[in-house]
Every structure is written in C-alpha cells, then in structure tokens.
Design a protein with these regions (language model features):
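N-terminal intrinsically disordered/low-complexity leader segments
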Residues: 1-9
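C-terminal peripheral helix-coil segments that are non-catalytic and often amphipathic
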Residues: 2, 119-131, 135, 155-195
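Helix-turn-helix
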Residues: 14, 18-56, 60
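Hydrophobic alpha-helical connector segments
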Residues: 60, 68-104
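Amphipathic alpha-helical packing segments from all-alpha helical-bundle domains
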Residues: 69-75, 107-134, 140, 144, ...
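Amphipathic alpha-helical segments used for helix-helix packing
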Residues: 88-120, 160-162
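Short alpha-helical scaffolding segments that buttress acidic/His motifs in well-ordered protein cores
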Residues: 99-103, 146-153
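Core catalytic ATP-binding domain of two-component histidine kinases
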Residues: 104-105, 109, 130, 150, ...
Length: 195
C-alpha cells in the first residue's frame, strides 16, 4: 500500500473515531465538522475531501459503530438463546448512545445505515428466532419480544446514571436491579421459544 493510501486510511479512521466519540455525546444535529476535525487533529476540509461532507462522515461512522457492535456480540455468541450475562449496551456504549442520539435528533437515515448494510443485530436476532421457531416470517410475538429486549437495553444505556442518581442506588440495589433487568430482557424471547 502506498504511503498516500496509508495516510488517507489513517485520516479517515481518525475522523470516524472522533465522530463516533462526539456523536454519542452531542448527537448528529449539534455536531459540527469543525468539532470533529479539531478532535481528530486534522483540517476540516479533509471531511469534505474524504467523505463529501458531514452527512457522508456520519454514514461511515454509524456503519463503523454497527460493525463494531456486531463484532463484539458475535465474539460473545449472542443469540436468542444466549443474550449474555452483561448488558449489551455496556459492551458497545458508543453504538447505543449514537443510535439514541440519532433517534432524538430525528435523523432516522443514520439508524437505517445498520439495516441497509446488513449490520442490524436486532434484525439478525429476529431472523434467528424466526428460524428457531420454523417460521417463514417473524410473528408479532417475535417482533414484540425483540422490541422489549431493545427497549430495556437502550433504556439502560440512556437512563442508568439518572436512575442511580434519582433512586440513590446502592451496590445491593444495583445487583437486584440487574437481576430484574435480565429477567425482563429475556422474558419475551423465552416466552416465544417455549411455545
């Protein structure tokens, strides 16, 4: 690979990494190309040069976040029968927060990036559940079970610090809360699997 290509890939990676970090904290609407470039330590014109502008960079960023999310969950063998023993949002926190920010900012095209790229773990889990139940297409119960798991995962990602502060959660409280969390997260899927 030429030195020019190595330099380009390095700049692209720095821009995507910076955008991923920043978008999860301020959201796509408040994020500026100058903020991203400053954080990445590059000239803001490089965003236009490599990505065609902010929108192109955000699409690349959301695709990268989804890819990393899929990789992490695949490493843990996450499936409808094994949602793991930790909140999924704690594995790829930037992904969850970036998705929440895109939804709150009404930038649903960024949410669709994972779907259009074949990188939606929620869709993949729904497809796996459909196959496990020998169905041709997902039922309303299957979609609802996955939706409940999504709600509790995204809810925890968005609200954990708020919950801790308002309810003054102790270590014991958090332990009980997490037991309930796992129970709720898996309830709908287990109900579908048991039918």
């Amino acid at each position: 690979m030429s030195e020019k290509n190595i330099g380009r890939k390095n700049v692209e990676k720095r821009l995507i990494d910076s955008a991923a970090f920043l978008v999860s904290s301020v959201g796509p609407n408040q994020l500026t190309i100058r903020d991203i470039a400053y954080h990445a330590g590059v000239n803001h014109a490089q965003i236009h040069h490599y990505f065609g502008g902010k929108k192109g960079l955000l699409i690349a960023t959301y695709k990268q976040l989804a890819f990393e999310h899929v990789q992490q969950l695949e490493r843990r063998n996450i499936s409808p029968t094994n949602l793991g023993d930790e909140p999924l949002s704690s594995i790829t926190d930037d992904y969850f927060k970036a998705i929440i920010r895109a939804v709150l900012d009404d930038q649903m095209y960024l949410v669709r990036v994972q779907i259009d790229s074949g990188l939606s773990m929620s869709r993949e889990t729904l497809n796996q559940l459909t196959k496990l139940k020998n169905q041709n297409k997902p039922t309303s119960e299957m979609k609802s079970a996955i939706a409940i798991a999504m709600v509790v995962e995204f809810g925890l990602s968005a609200m954990e610090e708020y919950i801790n502060e308002v309810l003054e959660m102790t270590a014991k409280d958090k332990k009980v809360f997490m037991e309930y969390f796992y129970e709720v997260r898996e309830h709908g899927i287990n109900k579908v699997l048991s039918k």
